[in-house]
Amino acid sequence: MKLILTAAIDNLGVPGDIVEVKAGYGRNYLLPRGYAVPATRGAEKQVQDLKRAQEARAIRDADRAREVKEQLANLEGVSVAVRTANNGKLFGSVKPNDVAQAVVAAGGPELDKHSIDMTKGFVKSTGKYSVDVKLHEDIHGTINFEVVSQ
């Protein structure tokens, strides 16, 4: 049975892939759950058109990501002001959302807080820090910022 996937299925494919599966798997699992549609000539042409549009959109997104990466590289004076104790320890921590707001306040581009990578842990003391930003699948930038006492 030939089907066009509408959702990512492990060990089978991604949305838009044309796959050949056993009739029972297609009829009893993929089609009822909406994970696939029957492959017809019209549907195959529609999938090809969608893939072309997605490729064009991916190229535009990559170009925009390169522009944002350049803006971040030229950005200076990013500082996050937080309340601290006398010894420089923060009351709380600096999170990705705080960094994104500081970038915008410094005249930089607006960033999604989920794209800022703080996997090493949140910042808990004053000083200079650097975090990575995922702008596109294979385009990453860096934000240098300083945590200062309020």
UniProtKB/Swiss-Prot annotation:
Belongs to the bacterial ribosomal protein bL9 family. HAMAP family: Ribosomal_bL9. The gene is rplI. GO terms for cellular component: ribonucleoprotein complex; ribosome. Keywords: Ribonucleoprotein, Ribosomal protein, RNA-binding, rRNA-binding. PROSITE patterns: RIBOSOMAL_L9. Pfam families: Ribosomal_L9_C, Ribosomal_L9_N. GO terms for molecular function: rRNA binding; structural constituent of ribosome. This is Large ribosomal subunit protein bL9. Binds to the 23S rRNA. GO terms for biological process: translation.
